[in-house]
């Protein structure tokens, strides 16, 4: 990239303070420290795994609590947004009525609305980005009304493409012009290729026989994880990239019997 991390760091800090990140300052070179509020705690089995891992691999494979955009200790900037502390309900996917985790609904849209300069356009499906061949830059977006199929163009000095993995690729592929006949920025036919997702099926589980005299209480919206450790500073395998692994330890409830033989016989 034509910019350094040092150029981005103050802006990372600015955004992280506004968003509200919880976690620890772990001092991991390939996972720079964030501006954090207190992180969530590990339970006894997770701490056991952490200690065993660090004994085996020292600092090569760090086990840390996941950093997440949940308010464990709201600051004034978050209270100004109308947000409250995370209640640890782990019902985040329903949308948090307390604004405990960062989202456009709880934070940036209300904040932008305070300026008086925000216009929200409902039912607008982005079709493509408008590229001006003469100016040599993007100048707007083309949207389609989901109800009427009417196409409208909106122009701006700055355009943010925040459509997640698949739709960002699709929008860029749709954004053809004389300069980019195969899609905006797609000079090398890379758009739409090499898209990666979390490997949700790549998991292992085990039963730990100890710590039966201990228990943990409450919930937690994040997990423990091991940041990427393969091919970080040197190539160690015959492929590029590495792994970032998450794990959690818990005491199973009565529903564990669902998957056991003999139930219902």
Question: Where are the regions that the model predicts?
Answer:
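FAD cofactor-binding and catalytic pocket of flavoenzymes
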Residues: 1-2, 67, 188-265
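Conserved redox-cofactor binding core of oxidoreductases
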Residues: 1-126
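Short, low-complexity, polar/charged sequence segments that are solvent-exposed and flexible
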Residues: 22, 82-87, 140-142, 146, ...
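Helix N-terminus capping/helix-initiation residues
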Residues: 43, 145, 232-234
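A short, glycine/Asx- and small/polar-enriched loop/turn
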Residues: 79-80, 132-139
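Sequence-level motif detector for i,i+2 pairs with an aromatic at +2
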Residues: 87, 136, 200-201
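Glycine-rich loop(s) and the adjacent beta-strand/alpha-helix scaffold that form part
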Residues: 98, 115, 124, 128-132, ...
């Amino acid at each position: 990239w034509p910019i350094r991390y040092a150029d981005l760091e103050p802006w990372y800090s600015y955004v992280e303070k506004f968003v509200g990140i919880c976690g620890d300052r772990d001092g991991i070179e390939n996972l720079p420290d964030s501006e954090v509020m207190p992180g969530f705690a590990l339970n006894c089995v997770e701490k056991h795994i952490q200690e065993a891992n660090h004994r085996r691999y020292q600092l090569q494979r760090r086990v840390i609590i996941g950093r997440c955009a949940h308010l464990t200790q709201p600051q004034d900037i978050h209270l100004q947004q109308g947000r409250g502390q995370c209640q640890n309900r782990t019902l985040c996917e329903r949308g948090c009525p307390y604004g405990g985790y960062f989202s456009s609904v709880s934070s940036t849209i209300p904040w932008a609305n305070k300026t008086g300069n925000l216009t929200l356009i409902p039912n607008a499906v982005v079709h493509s980005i408008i590229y001006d061949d003469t100016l040599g830059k993007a100048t707007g977006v083309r949207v389609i009304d989901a109800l009427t199929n009417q196409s409208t163009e909106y122009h701006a000095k700055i355009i943010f493409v925040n459509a997640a993995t698949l739709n960002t690729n699709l929008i860029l592929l749709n954004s053809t012009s004389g300069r980019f006949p195969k899609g905006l920025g797609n000079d090398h036919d890379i758009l739409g290729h090499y898209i990666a997702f979390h490997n949700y099926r790549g998991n292992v589980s085990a039963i730990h026989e100890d710590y039966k005299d201990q228990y943990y209480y409450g919930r937690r919206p994040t997990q423990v994880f091991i940041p990427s450790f393969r091919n970080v500073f040197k190539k160690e395998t015959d492929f590029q990239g590495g792994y970032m692994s998450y794990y959690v330890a818990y005491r199973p409830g009565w529903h564990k019997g669902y998957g056991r033989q003999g139930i219902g016989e």
